[in-house]
């Protein structure tokens, strides 16, 4: 997994509405944002608490390196010294950094995150058929079944020039899909999607899935010089029952192969499902920095008593 061009990354980060500026990690600048959390259902976390966190963040109390709306595109480099020098012009209360691996630093609390699932594209895969042919019969049958089951869904590229027409519906489907899965939902999903379209232009790909002339799902991806990153996915409940999720993932893999990408990052969540497609987990974690003793105690308490790492079993769909 290789990061996208830093200048392009910074341009995207600075275009988000919650962009804050730059923090310095061991003297190197890295963009940060004011953390935005949302939980429309209120199923797991009291929305009042989330509003309080968001208020603290907008007041400059919590700084998040990068943006939770664009995970996995860049990771700050962490030295092996066991300590990182972090400078923040506003000297906020808490800084949160998503990094590869699980480094132990003397001035940070490390909390594990769900792995990013990354598929390395083999040189022998000149087409999507080559990719399927590399699978063992068991997984080849599963893949073909997922593709056959969704044959009644047609797919077409959504034009960025006509983004105003499809973004509202896609934003609604994305919010519906994520509402029980993550806290990191932008309060304004439409504006977030517009930011990707406006900033990345032709490097931002969006495909819509239609059944009976109705848009039932979409998936987006970012093309970089080295690879493809699956980004946003939204679909209706019926489309989910029809295994359209798997079809979308396979279509992004198809795009990556045809685009001669070195890898396709399928993002977080659904770890076992993505492993059946050949993706491998990429360990990453969050580093929490704070100078406040009470805040340090709270973060360590959360890690010890509340944080749970999901268990999963990695599958190998390939013959070799």
Question: Can you name each region flagged by the protein language model?
Answer:
Residues 38-111, 227-286:
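Acyl-donor binding region in acyl/amide transferases
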Residues 59-64, 148-151, 186-189, 237-238, ...:
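Short C-terminal domain-edge/linker segments immediately following a structured domain
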Residues 1-43, 95-241:
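A conserved beta-strand-loop-helix scaffold within acyl/acetyltransferase catalytic domains
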Residues 16-20, 26, 65, 81, ...:
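Feature targets compositionally biased, intrinsically disordered low-complexity regions
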Residues 55-56, 120-122, 142-145, 179-183, ...:
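Glycine-rich loops and low-complexity Gly/Arg-rich segments
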């Amino acid at each position: 997994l290789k990061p996208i061009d830093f200048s392009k990354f910074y341009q995207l980060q600075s275009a988000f509405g919650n962009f804050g500026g730059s923090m310095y990690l061991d003297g190197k600048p890295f963009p940060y944002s004011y953390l935005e959390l949302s939980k429309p259902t209120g199923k797991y976390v009291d929305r009042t608490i989330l509003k309080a966190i968001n208020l603290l963040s907008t007041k400059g109390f919590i700084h998040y390196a990068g943006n939770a709306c664009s995970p996995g595109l860049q990771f700050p480099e962490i030295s092996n010294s066991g300590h990182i020098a972090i400078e923040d012009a506003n000297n906020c209360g808490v800084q949160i950094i998503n990094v590869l691996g699980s480094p132990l630093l003397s001035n940070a609390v490390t909390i594990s995150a769900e792995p990013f699932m990354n598929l390395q594209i083999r040189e022998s895969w000149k087409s999507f058929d080559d990719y399927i042919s590399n699978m063992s019969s068991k997984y080849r049958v599963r893949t073909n079944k997922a593709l056959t089951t969704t044959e009644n869904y047609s797919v077409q590229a959504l034009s960025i020039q006509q983004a105003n027409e499809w973004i509202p519906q896609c934003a609604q489907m994305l919010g519906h899909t994520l509402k029980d899965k993550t806290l990191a939902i932008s309060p304004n999903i439409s504006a977030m999607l517009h930011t990707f379209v406006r900033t990345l232009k032709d490097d931002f790909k969006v495909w819509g899935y239609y059944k009976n002339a109705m848009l039932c799902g979409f998936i987006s991806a970012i093309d970089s010089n080295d690879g493809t990153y699956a980004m946003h996915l939204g679909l209706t409940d019926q489309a989910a029952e029809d295994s359209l999720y798997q079809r979308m993932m396979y279509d992004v893999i198809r795009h990556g192969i045809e685009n001669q990408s070195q890898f396709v990052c399928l993002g977080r969540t659904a770890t076992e499902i993505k492993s059946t497609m050949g993706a491998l987990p990429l360990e990453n974690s969050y580093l929490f920095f704070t100078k406040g003793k009470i805040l340090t105690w709270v973060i360590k308490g959360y890690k010890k008593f509340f944080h749970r790492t999901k268990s999963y079993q990695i599958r190998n769909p390939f013959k070799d």
